[in-house]
Amino acid sequence: MKKTALAMLATLLCAGAVHAQTASNAAAPASRLDEVIARGTLRACTTGDYKPYSFYKSDGQFEGIDIDMAESLAHSLGVKAEFVKTSWPNLMNDFVAKCDIGIGGVSTTLERQKRAFFTDAYMVDGKTPIVRCDDVNKFQTVEQIDQPSTRVIVNPGGTNEKFARQFFPHASLTVYPDNVTVFKQILAGKADVMVTDASETLLQQKLNPGLCSVHPDKPFQFGEKAWLLPRGDMVFQQYVNQWLHLARATGEYQAIQDKWLK
């Protein structure tokens, strides 16, 4: 009798466990990974104004380091990459509402982390000045820049503007709407300095002879570049991180970076 009762109890416990597992699986939300594969497209939000990571050309196409990498990620999933143009002030809202990933030289910040996951960082960066080459010695430090006579220029809505407002309260600050042509303002003598990511200053000094990056190897602060991912979706995050790990380990990422920076 005892054996029969124990057997029945064991059967009931097993059945309950199976039912609980089935219910748990049914209740588990689908990962964005599955949605992307089912949809057949990977939607990437990007500003298109930040060389060498993302640039929106006159023909309506995007190019840059992050664009090539997003194409690679999409290929690994067997889908097509679809790029959604946004702006730095609207990046987070557009990403949450419209996209699977957010790319294009995005700096990791705790404020952004509140609304999204980040991938593993793929580049260490930091804020440093770019100025006319004759002025390199004049703008070496935050204190030298933060003077009423200094004309600082920044693009709106991102970490550059936040940095400038925090560290240059005494300087004359101009928020210039076009992050592509903003460097021409310095060349033309309409501004003295822009503080942006060191990687961008290195490229822009090549594109704009007469401009020089100031100590890009010793930026004012520590920064990293990573991609935005949907908050809470660890399955998708793990896939993208593994893809990124392999892209770096195999040299694919380095080859793409060299294509745009060398």
What does each model-found stretch correspond to?
Residues I67, E82-N93, N137-F139, T174-A188, ...:
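Short helix-initiation/N-cap motifs at beta->coil->alpha
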Residues C133-T150:
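Flexible hinge/capping segments at coil-to-helix
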Residues L73, D94-V96, I145, I186-L187, ...:
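Hydrophobic residues within well-ordered alpha-helices
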Residues V124-V131, A198, L202-H245, K262:
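Periplasmic-binding protein-like
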